[in-house]
Amino acid sequence: MQRARPTLWAAALTLLVLLRGPPVARAGASSAGLGPVVRCEPCDARALAQCAPPPAVCAELVREPGCGCCLTCALSEGQPCGIYTERCGSGLRCQPSPDEARPLQALLDGRGLCVNASAVSRLRAYLLPAPPAPGNASESEEDRSAGSVESPSVSSTHRVSDPKFHPLHSKIIIIKKGHAKDSQRYKVDYESQSTDTQNFSSESKRETEYGPCRREMEDTLNHLKFLNVLSPRGVHIPNCDKKGFYKKKQCRPSKGRKRGFCWCVDKYGQPLPGYTTKGKEDVHCYSMQSK
């Protein structure tokens, strides 16, 4: 289990590196105050002393994936790569296939490819064009207006007479919005009043349908829902019959060294006279048994 933790951290860090972009972009993000997501332990002399000698025949040596400090052979262009494989060489990035339906899963399975980083950047810029700057918003609007189907022979006076730009039309829109807002407010108030009425009717219906024991049990269970720490001390779930009234024998459970006890009540939960046996475990309630 302890050996699996560094592997998981290495996989998480490698995935973040692949998704966050090249080292230049990551350095810019760190200088902007974002900072790295995962901080690796420094590769000091003690960590480097535990590394095995690097392979003898390697075109390029790179660090192990994730937070590893040892050196290993870099992957060349076109070789398969992924989260758990070695790093790609200089100027290369591990990318899933363009037609891959599940790109992240492909990287986890090692089905990516080491491709040229500059080609990846050009492809990303082509597929994901940068949003227009705030200062060029008006220019883009003018370009879209110029490229519309509107004939250039239409005079400017005809555009001004458009009812959308008429002051009276603007006032009508404001009035309609005000009416819609008032009607929506009335609708919300009406729905809240109707909901309160329904809740009151359901509460009154519950009072007539269920007995006092059932109501106490439901109130206790509802109270337990809002407790952050559930403790058996002080929590008593009553013993109810099918009609919601109290059964004759009510008991409290044992709490550690303190033994539980039982007592006798009537159908409304009132203690029965003559049954002063509170504190005894074996209690027999004979008369007035609730059905």
Curated annotation (Swiss-Prot):
Stretch list, region IGF-binding: 28-134
Glycosylation positions in this chain: 116, 136, 199
GO terms under biological process: apoptotic process; MAPK cascade; negative regulation of cell population proliferation; negative regulation of protein phosphorylation; negative regulation of signal transduction; negative regulation of smooth muscle cell migration; negative regulation of smooth muscle cell proliferation; osteoblast differentiation
Disulfide bonds: 40-67, 43-69, 51-70, 58-73, 81-94, 88-114, 213-240, 251-262, 264-285
Ranges annotated as biased composition (Low complexity): 146-156
Compositional bias ranges of the Polar residues kind: 191-202
Start and end residues of each IGFBP N-terminal domain: 36-117
Alphabetical keyword list: Apoptosis, Disulfide bond, Glycoprotein, Growth factor binding, Nucleus, Phosphoprotein, Secreted, Signal
Effect noted on mutating residue 252 to C: In a colorectal cancer sample; somatic mutation
CDD domains reported in the protein's UniProt record: TY
InterPro entries: Growth_fac_rcpt_cys_sf (IPR009030), IGFBP-3 (IPR012211), IGFBP-like (IPR000867), IGFBP_1-6_chordata (IPR022321), Insulin_GF-bd_Cys-rich_CS (IPR017891), Thyroglobulin_1 (IPR000716), Thyroglobulin_1_sf (IPR036857)
Effect of residue 202 to A: No change in apoptotic potential
Induction comment from the UniProt entry of this chain: Up-regulated in the presence of IGF1, insulin and other growth-stimulating factors such as growth hormone, EGF and phorbol esters.
Region entry Disordered, spans: 130-162, 189-211
Residue ranges of domain Thyroglobulin type-1 in the record: 210-285
Main location: secreted
One GO CC annotation: insulin-like growth factor binding protein complex
Alphabetized SUPFAM superfamilies for the sequence: Growth factor receptor domain (SSF57184), Thyroglobulin type-1 domain (SSF57610)
Tissue-specific expression: Expressed by most tissues. Present in plasma.
Swiss-Prot/TrEMBL domain comment: The thyroglobulin type-1 domain mediates interaction with HN.
Function of the molecule: Multifunctional protein that plays a critical role in regulating the availability of IGFs such as IGF1 and IGF2 to their receptors and thereby regulates IGF-mediated cellular processes including proliferation, differentiation, and apoptosis in a cell-type specific manner. Also exhibits IGF-independent antiproliferative and apoptotic effects mediated by its receptor TMEM219/IGFBP-3R. Inhibits the positive effect of humanin on insulin sensitivity. Promotes testicular germ cell apoptosis.
Subunit structure: Interacts with XLKD1. Binds IGF2 more than IGF1. Forms a ternary complex of about 140 to 150 kDa with IGF1 or IGF2 and a 85 kDa glycoprotein (ALS). Interacts with humanin; humanin competes with importin KPNB1 for binding to IGFBP3, blocking IGFBP3 nuclear import and IGFBP3-mediated apoptosis. Interacts with TMEM219. Interacts with RXRA; this interaction modulates the transcriptional activity of RXRA. Interacts with LRP1; this interaction mediates cell growth inhibition independent of IGF1.
Name listed for the protein in its UniProt record: Insulin-like growth factor-binding protein 3
Species for this entry: Homo sapiens
Annotated gene: IGFBP3
